[in-house]
Amino acid sequence: MRQHESYKCNVCGNIVELSHLGGGKLHCCGKEMECITTDLTSVVLMKAFAGESMARNKYEYFAKIAQKEGYRDIAEHFQRAANNEKMHAKLELKAYNVLNYDKEFGNTSENLQYAIDGESYENLTMYPDFSKVAKDEGHAEISKMLALIGKVEIEHENMYRMLKQRLDAGKEHVSDEEEEWICEECGHIHRGKKALKVCPVCKHPLEYQSRLNSKK
């Protein structure tokens, strides 16, 4: 038995993660539980990724607080550490992806699908469940907040679905109807069925041209 391994009861389906090492074996429903962890390295990589990601966010919040309180040097230290944690998280996610998918990251279409799946889980399962937990324990305001965040995730899912559909159809820079396209660098606006290959003002290429209505 190793810390962070997961064990499953083959009778009721209960799954537990071993958080502390101890003697003996795990039992449920009168039966010995089966270890279902086949790749502990992947498990600890994702735990490290989650921990570093949370630390990065916390340190950025702490930096803003220090800034507001007039402690600029402390704010800079918090922000520098946050940037370090971001890189740590990136390295851990890349290592996980290489172990499991033989590549560091997916392409944009694959990443959009990953985002769709994540947002769908959050709005259909995670936030409704978490909202209920808070409500059952008498935390009405927290329950409401979690439920409302879940509704935002629906919009995120819809946004990613639209972007993936457009990308997969080869219409990221073309449209069936006339639209306004804006240069991200200088703000030049062009109206037409496709974005300009080169901005006539600042000469930035196609990838800097995007639909103006998507910015509203």
Label each residue range with its predicted role.
Residues 15, 19-21, 38-216:
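Non-heme di-metal
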Residues 10-11, 27-30, 185, 201:
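Short, cysteine/histidine-rich loop/knuckle motifs that typically chelate Zn2+
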